[in-house]
């Protein structure tokens, strides 16, 4: 009974007050970099920048980069070369394939990966390697229809290839023409992933979606020899005209002299 009474008494005893222990506050965050600039020497402050500004600067630099075609005259027409993240088209009956191979050679020599969607099945690996193409950095896709070619180009652009070339071959192009919406989707994919897209076709296909459009006129042969001596084909002369560009006034043209490789 005594034990039970003791337990009952303990239930009704006044409760002890809890002591509130103050919790120390964390130290204030360091001052923003912008607030520190006035306290630094001018020579040091001029060399500092914020992380956000650095990201914006790198993005601008990336957009301004180009991939050269290695034809100086053509690069000058395009303002330095093929713009990254943009679609450029070269159409016509001229020697378009020479520009295609030269551009792939330039990209692979810079250490970049290139995808070639070869609808016309025109690539000769041995000749391409002799022209400076690093075949280890080239993915060669050989579609059967034009729809497959456009789909393959979009997949390559979305998976990290810095240069994608879609060559439609000689007319007639195999398969039906794709709708304009497919070109719009392809252009947006390239812009989103920073991929440079070069479309080579016997006639204009991309419409208003391309950043620039070149037209290659039919080449004219150049011969060596005269009189009774046999004439030897020395090369071809081709005129390339800038038909459209969103930042450069179109209408200019240049002549290219392409030699015959023995």
Regions found by a protein language model. Give the residues of each.
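Detector for small/aliphatic-rich hydrophobic stretches
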Residues: 1-116, 262
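Surface-exposed loop/turn and secondary-structure junction residues enriched for glycine/proline
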Residues: 70, 77-81, 85, 126, ...
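Solvent-exposed alpha-helices and their adjacent loops that cap or buttress functional pockets
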Residues: 82, 157, 189-191
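Hydrophobic/aromatic beta-strand patches that form the interior of the parallel beta-sheet core
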Residues: 88-90, 115-117, 139-141, 198, ...
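Conserved inter-motif catalytic segment of the P-loop NTP-binding fold
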Residues: 93, 102, 110-177, 181
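Catalytic-core regions built around general acid/base machinery
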Residues: 103-107, 181-192
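Phosphate-binding/switch region of NTP-binding enzymes
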Residues: 187-262
